[in-house]
Amino acid sequence: MHLRGCACHLSLYCVYNDWENKIYRVPIFQCLFLEAETRSLKTFLIRGQSLDQESLNEIEVTRKETMLWDLQEQSNMMDKKIAAISSLIMNNGELLRKLSKFFVPLTVVLGDDGLEILEAYVCGEEPMLPLDTVPVILRCVGDYAALDTKHLLSNECTQASKKLRFGYSVMDFHFSLTVSDVKICFSHTDTGEAVCEKMKQIFYFSVCAFGGEQVLLVTPKNAYALLFDDDLCLLLLQSVFAFLHEKIFAVYKQVLVQLCEYIGPDLWPFGNERSVSFIGYPNLWLLSVSDLERRVPDTTYICREILSFCGLAPILGPRGRHAIPVIRELSVEMPGSETSLQRFRFNSQYVSSESLCFQTGPEDTHLFFSDSDMYVVTLPDCLRLLLKSTVPRAFLPCFDENATEIELLLKFMSRLQHRSYALFDAVIFMLDAFVSAFQRACTLMEMRWLLVRDLHVFYLTCDGKDSHVVMPLLQTAVENCWEKITEIKQRPAFQCMEISRCGFVFYARFFLSSGLSQSKEAHWTVTASKYLSACIRANKTGLCFASITVYFQDMMCVFIANRYNVSYWIEEFDPNDYCLEYHEGLLDCSRYTAVMSEDGQLVRQARGIALTDKINFSYYILVTLRVLRRWVESKFEDVEQAEFIRWENRMLYEHIHLLHLN
């Protein structure tokens, strides 16, 4: 029997022993398959090749066994475990390799039972996106067992890791699964029969014979992804699926029990990417979404997100990614190993070696001031065009031309470097060659190179030139360099912003710049950047305290107007970089949102709840004034500097209480 469609998800069902045929450690895989003709989802099984005992031991390492007091050893053990899991799924035969290329059109050959996939043939390059499906949305609340906070005082690992070491657990919980307009509520007190009846509203249950055993296939009716909010505690998430798994298989006692093993960032002592995977049950994608209460992503975005993984869920590591070939030869010579590209980092992204860029730790601070005009050149789709010309269509996420998807593009780029070395180097080399050519053109125009952000935003400074002359020259330089280096006919969209007579950059825990002064985003860094730009521009020849007072009061008015606006104040932080106050749940093991507290620690702040009373508004004002003070120190004499400090103290005394009024 032949069936046309595409694989939407692939996982392990279990590893079992075929006692009758004396075949041991046989992995059974399950594939969630979208049939093209009926547009319906089906679950098929694949019989894998027998494992050796060593590989099985690495896969079966328990959480308790990984909780070592040597943190680096714990991290290494988890790396070995996910490497073994990924290798099992990706390298257990050519058939599984084909099925792990999600949304690629396939024709599968089924066995006589219509249950087992025996072979698969690729029958197209254009991704077959299941756009008529809808995601399952998980929401959950619960209570936790009390934990002595003295166990959490040290900073050697994340708070989540320390909690798990000391037996942190969920006492009770309630959750709901929502598909379209169907919402099903569950409680930890539900019986197995009640759970199965509820689950059958959105999942098909079927018991089938396979390899001399009975297996239970749980197939979503019209979904291949489950979404949960970034701010959902990962311990609650684990509890939900452990509960569902236990209750379902307690009812279906006669079947071969499916695995249900959680892999998430809290299993690493220093945290990991915000990604989750269950080996076994459930057989669908679990995706973390920011601010899910207010914005449910559409199916197209979910497909792009999955394609950007380049294979399995990111938490399963580099071995869970495909080696993607390059679809065109470069006309310019690639550098050899001795002259390989030097890649520096700024804002956690790779940038050209020709740019001035920063390698910052959590407490590093970088400042730049200039009396020159600053130009910010943005090429929002340059990465998309480069990837489109080098990545095979079947592997390329269908990125929109909208610049808001730059974060997804950058994540896709970063994942290419682990297995798709030639492709990653080709894209980076073309980008580096283009940036180098653009830099030389800017130098000929007597413009100074400052930095590159996120591979597509270029900061430059220039003296005494009319912007009506400079901007067309910059656009011409971009277009000529692009056409010459990349040989891509479509030119990147060009955006250029001029900030006259004021150029500054401040980078520490956050980014302030005159380049943000024209942004319409509602965030304190934008307001602070506008204030600093106005002060620097108005006081180039002398320090006028009347003007900086007016600008300061304008800034305070905006701060006060956003007093209760959570998104205005929160920042994102990497796990284990800063000291974080105690909070309920496991919420700091991946990148998280927080605000600064009165005692200098971060306070975990979710997007969907009211702003914490512990926020220290003074911190944000002081940081802004600190940047302005550094500018005063670089520009004026000791007398003005002393007067500025007195003015600064007075402003704080007169205004800070306004932010704390209810």
From Swiss-Prot:
Give the record's GO CC terms.
host cell nucleus
Taxon lineage:
Viruses, Duplodnaviria, Heunggongvirae, Peploviricota, Herviviricetes
Q: How does it assemble?
A: Associates with the primase and the helicase to form the helicase-primase complex. Interacts with the origin-binding protein. Interacts with the polymerase catalytic subunit.
Family statement drawn from the similarity comment of this UniProt entry = Belongs to the herpesviridae HEPA family.
**Listed name of the protein:** DNA helicase/primase complex-associated protein
Please classify the protein's predominant subcellular localization into one broad category. host cell
Query: Which organism is the protein's source?
Result: Human herpesvirus 6B (strain Z29) (HHV-6 variant B)
Alphabetical UniProt keywords: DNA replication, Host nucleus
Q: Which InterPro entries does the entry link to?
A: HSV_HEPA (IPR004996)
Subcellular location as annotated: Host nucleus
Tell me, in a sentence or two, what this protein's role is.
Component of the helicase/primase complex. Unwinds the DNA at the replication forks and generates single-stranded DNA for both leading and lagging strand synthesis. The primase synthesizes short RNA primers on the lagging strand that the polymerase presumably elongates using dNTPs. The primase-associated factor has no known catalytic activity in the complex and may serve to facilitate the formation of the replisome by directly interacting with the origin-binding protein and the polymerase.
The record, for Pfam families, names: Herpes_HEPA
Taxonomy, superkingdom: Viruses
Name a biological process GO annotation: DNA replication
